[in-house]
Amino acid sequence: MCDLCNGEDALPRRQFLRLAAVGAVTVAAGVALDHGTAAAKPKSSGSTTPKVERVAAPAIVTRAQWGADESIRDNHIVGWAPFRKIIVHHTASPNGVKDPAAAVRFGYKLHVIDRKFTDIGYNFLIGPDGEIFEGRRARRYGKGELHTGEDGAGNAIIGGHTKGRNAGTCGIALIGNFMKTPPSNAAIESLIHLIAWEAQRHKIDPMGRDPYIATDSTHLDFFNIAGHRDIGSTLCPGTRMAASLGWLRKQVAERAGRFPERKADMRRLAWVIN
């Protein structure tokens, strides 16, 4: 798993409530193919792209389907918050795996047993063949219900992928090491699809830089679709992935549309403290 994807946030109830009052949020995203370097840092225009079609829900491999051993995880849930940003990771594991589900199981055990997480840190993982895997468990789903990682009100389970920046951020990990090698086209296509779907559902501007307040009350300025290295001391999601973030944002914006910038003092995350 990626270096420094060691970040579950153990926050006291008082701090959770304070963050809810100011509208805390987190970020996620990063990608890489040879599509050019990351673009300059534009502010959200506040406009909406006209005639954008609804992004269809992607197929998601459930925890049961990839073989999660539910007996090893902690049933404690840190909290819930709607996605406001996307953070892209790589697992920094060998490329070209033949059995992506086995790689997900390995990462799950690494996070839970070795790093003492309550569960796998990522919200979603994507294999080299483009399969999208359910990450951290949110709840029991009904028959035929899509495993979104959210409660019934659209609040997402808080992950453990970027320490101090987990609340409100969707952590997506591409399986592999993308320092010198780019992800497969299939993986990139699934990444674009997944982010566009989340962006449209949660009204995240793919080209924007909405204000974000970390769990330690630090005010951060970064893209709504960002790489782990943009907000942490790490090489994740790999040099080749990070170089294509600007291109990725544009691809997502074409599919999902644009949305008005959120102001930090106007956001109110719906926290549920267990």
Residue ranges and their predicted role:
Residues 2-12, 16-21, 29-91, 127-150, ...:
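Basic/polar, cationic surfaces and motifs that engage anionic cell-wall
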Residues 81-116, 121:
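Active-site acidic/histidine clusters and adjacent loop/turn architecture
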Residues 124:
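Conserved, mostly hydrophobic/aromatic
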